[in-house]
Swiss-Prot record:
Its EC number is 5.6.2.3. Homohexamer. It comes from Salmonella phage P22. Residues 164-436 form the SF4 helicase domain. Renders P22 DNA replication independent of a functional dnaB gene of the host. One of its GO terms (molecular function) is DNA helicase activity. It catalyses: Couples ATP hydrolysis with the unwinding of duplex DNA at the replication fork by translocating in the 5'-3' direction. This creates two antiparallel DNA single strands (ssDNA). The leading ssDNA polymer is the template for DNA polymerase III holoenzyme which synthesizes a continuous strand; ATP + H2O = ADP + phosphate + H(+). SUPFAM superfamilies: N-terminal domain of DnaB helicase, P-loop containing nucleoside triphosphate hydrolases. The lineage of its organism: Viruses, Duplodnaviria, Heunggongvirae, Uroviricota, Caudoviricetes. This is Replicative DNA helicase. CDD domains: DnaB_C.
Amino acid sequence: MRQDIEASVIGGLLIGGLTPTASDVLATLEPEAFSIPLYRKAFEVIRKQARNRNLIDGLMVAEECGDEYATAVMMTARSCPSAANLKGYAGMVADSYQRRQVLQLLDEMREPISNGTLDASGRAMDELVKRLSSIRKPRNEVKPVRLGEIINDYTDTLDRRLRNGEESDTLKTGIEELDAITGGMNAEDLVIIAARPGMGKTELALKIAEGVASRVIPGSGVRRGVLIFSMEMSAIQVVERGIAGAGMMSVSVLRNPSRMDDEGWARVASGMKLLAELDVWVVDASRLSVEEIRSISERHKQEHPNLSLIMADYLGLIEKPKAERNDLAIAHISGSLKAMAKDLKTPVISLSQLSRDVEKRPNKRPTNADLRDSGSIEQDADSIIMLYREAVYDENSSAAPFAEIIVTKNRFGSLGTVYQRFCNGHFVACDQDEARQICTASNAPAGRRKRYAQGADV
């Protein structure tokens, strides 16, 4: 059966010539998809001929295949009745190839998983997950679409936004001033939150996660879901941060519960209740590859269709692929995160460190040029949000109580700065005009600045 289908693809290409359908098949199918050596060789020659000479000629293909295959190639062409179902047969060949790859991988990994030591078996299972996610699925046909056809879809989008009002199809962070600048996150966005250590990256990310998970998907009555890959903090620490944030308490208070009064315990209970009601999931793992992150996210999206945001804390802790240079590895990770957002139709937020060079400047407010390791992060990101707190450098500054959330890139909107008070390690809304005046006017002398203030939260 498999041989007949593969023969039908080769025969259809040979008798049909270089039609648009044939071009689609040549663009989406790989020679390795053919299990029969004869057809694999014939497909390689056909594709080479189509690319180099812009034609498919049966006699020329047979000749280039050599004496071993020439006669069989011509017989394949003669025995094919029609090229009418070429695309359907090609899809069957691609599906069969993917199944063979999966079965071969399972056979290869069965022994080390079944009979290896506990550690070796665990490593083998990790390798199985990674390689399964790397098996390329058969590519769907890619073709141009006329703008006139897309306009109908966009009309539906506008109508949905009109009906839903503030609850549009962009994802809101829960920080009103930030949403006013960015317009919210689109379904395919990669958002980077970057800062030097101690500025509050993780705290801001968790605040956004809570803001997203507190909202309902328009028209469904179902709350939005969030998936957090926490590679720096344990799941317990994430919960602790969440409870502290909900109760507007310092994390240090929760670490000394014997000192809490009744009001403190009431805040803890309220925070626990709030977090328990949110559909927020945490993957607690110190090292994950970007392929593993994608595999887990795909499975979670299938099981929980309300998943609305994926968060990775942080980009520098994602396991790097083998590459000649570190910037190439980072480029692979950022590009893969962007592709995941696009394919899953779910925005991805990734935290990132900034270069130490920012510390060498008199004005330490970060820019996109300070992104560590690779300019590809700036290229792949749809939005970049930088954090700056004057208190990290000068606790006595008049601007010390405030945090600046700086939108330095916004592919679909404007740039700007949002101000929040930073109280007990948490971001709190404040009067924007007042904060702007104080932070703009503040210009502490370089000699008075400290590199890092004591006790800053990460």
